[in-house]
UniProtKB/Swiss-Prot annotation:
GO MF terms, alphabetically ordered: glutamate racemase activity
EC identifiers of the protein: 5.1.1.3
Protein name from the UniProt record: Glutamate racemase
Reaction equation(s) it catalyzes: L-glutamate = D-glutamate
HAMAP family linked to this entry: Glu_racemase
Functional summary from the UniProt entry: Provides the (R)-glutamate required for cell wall biosynthesis.
Organism: Neisseria meningitidis serogroup B (strain ATCC BAA-335 / MC58)
SUPFAM superfamilies reported for this sequence: Aspartate/glutamate racemase (SSF53681)
Keyword Cell wall biogenesis/degradation: yes
Gene: murI
Active site residues per record: 77 (proton donor/acceptor), 189 (proton donor/acceptor)
Recorded family membership: Belongs to the aspartate/glutamate racemases family.
EC category: isomerase
Length: 270
């Protein structure tokens, strides 16, 4: 019976396709885990929507994943984590629920040496102040500087990962953070890990915190602690569900995932 519990999938969800960077990190860190991904591609972006709407959409996704008997959930969306994280945890009870903001904040605090942390994220995540709150809960003396970097999202989706336009945009966004003397930078949007090489070069000696990797590490730790790690599965099952299959979805999705997407299925929620 215990083994059946361990074989249950991890549910990962996002408002769109950015959360596939989290799936990729989970596949690498936990290669024996079955994974179900849901991306709400019909209703993306969430960032411009009200708190009530984001909570409502998030609950629909959580219900969908619960129907698929997941053993844990990963909120692979900074907006959902910031706005609806608490409500999701209330709904799921004792089930482990991981999220990119908690994991990113924890890793940033463990990384910084001078107690000055920068965050680049979308407008909604920056305005929610969720990263600063998560960091200050653990260390109120840390200087947290946030910078909205919305233009990087379409550049990543266009595949301009090393383009001069992207480099110049990154430079502009980093300027105020570097001027404040940060030594650690959190990539606070699920699209940004794809720009890690470029951001790393432009940020110099600043340590980069990749929320996808830190969330995968935290997931591994929690599953082990709860006795839910799958240690006997050489042929894991990966399923991808979306609420719409927009133009170029597979191309962009496979870029994020770093591999082909076999099973993509469209479902409508709500």
């Amino acid at each position: 019976m215990e083994n059946i519990g361990r074989q249950r999938p991890i549910g990962v969800f996002d408002s769109g396709i950015g959360g596939l960077t989290n799936v990729r990190a989970l596949m690498e860190r936990l290669p024996m885990e079955n994974i179900i991904y849901f991306g709400d591609t019909a209703r993306v972006p969430y960032g411009t929507k009200s708190k009530a709407t984001i909570e409502n959409f998030s609950m629909q996704i959580v219900d969908f994943l619960l129907e698929h008997d997941v053993k844990a959930m990963v909120i692979a969306c900074n907006t959902i984590a910031a706005v609806a994280g608490q409500k999701i945890r209330q709904k799921t009870g004792n089930m482990p629920v991981l999220d990119v903001i908690s994991a990113g904040a924890k890793a940033a605090l463990a990384t910084t040496r001078n107690n000055k942390i920068g965050i680049i994220a979308t407008n909604t995540t920056v305005n929610s102040n969720a990263y600063a709150r998560a960091i200050h809960r653990n260390n109120p003396d840390t200087l947290v500087r946030t910078q909205a970097a919305p233009l990087l999202v379409p550049l990543v989706e266009e595949g301009w990962l090393e383009h001069e336009v992207t480099r110049l945009t990154v430079c502009e966004y980093l300027k105020p953070l570097l001027a404040d003397g940060i030594d650690t930078l959190v990539l606070g949007c699920t699209h940004f890990p794809l720009l890690k090489p470029l951001i790393g070069r432009e940020a110099g000696n600043v340590a980069l915190v990749d929320s996808a990797i830190t969330t995968a590490e935290e997931t591994a730790r929690v599953l082990a602690q709860e006795g839910l790690l799958n240690t006997d599965n050489n042929n894991p099952d990966y399923r991808f569900y979306v609420s719409d299959i927009p133009l170029k979805f597979r191309t962009i999705g496979e870029r994020f995932l770093g591999r082909t997407m076999e099973q993509i299925e469209m479902v409508s929620l709500g």
